[in-house]
From Swiss-Prot:
Role summary: Activator of cell division through the inhibition of FtsZ GTPase activity, therefore promoting FtsZ assembly into bundles of protofilaments necessary for the formation of the division Z ring. It is recruited early at mid-cell but it is not essential for cell division.
Gene Ontology cellular component terms for the protein in this record: cell division site; cell septum; cytosol; plasma membrane
Name the record gives this protein: Cell division protein ZapA
UniProt KW Coiled coil keyword: yes
PANTHER family: CELL DIVISION PROTEIN ZAPA
Naturally occurring in which organism (per UniProt): Erwinia tasmaniensis (strain DSM 17950 / CFBP 7177 / CIP 109463 / NCPPB 4357 / Et1/99)
Organism classification: Bacteria, Pseudomonadati, Pseudomonadota, Gammaproteobacteria, Enterobacterales
Length: 109
């Protein structure tokens, strides 16, 4: 489906962006989050220059994204290691089962 114009209010300013209809709710939530971040920064930093606040917010968001990417990479690496260990355990168990079957002459069917 094609993108449609959506009007947003962020930090007292109107902004029109194109967005697919199925993503409009997520866009509105993102705009609300950004607006809240800018308001919080304004209070916390006492910076009044909107451009500076936007840059600070962008840097904070980029930092958060980098942290989340790092966590995701660490988690994926951990899961890959666990999967390899499980595969080795299963392979070892199957080899042992094969040796036991050969010794006893038992067929499992």
């Amino acid at each position: 489906m094609s993108a449609q114009p959506v009007d947003l209010q962020i930090f007292g300013r109107s902004l029109r962006v194109n967005c697919p209809p199925e993503q409009q709710d997520a866009l509105n939530l993102a705009a609300e989050d950004l607006n809240q971040r800018l308001q919080d920064l304004k209070v916390r930093t006492r910076v009044t220059n909107t451009e500076q606040l936007v840059f600070i917010a962008a840097l904070n968001i980029c930092h958060e994204l980098a942290q989340e990417k790092s966590k995701t990479r660490d988690y994926a690496s951990n899961m890959e290691q666990r999967i390899r260990m499980l595969q080795q355990t299963i392979e070892q168990a199957l080899l042992e089962q094969g040796r036991i079957t050969e010794r006893t002459g038992t067929n499992f069917e």
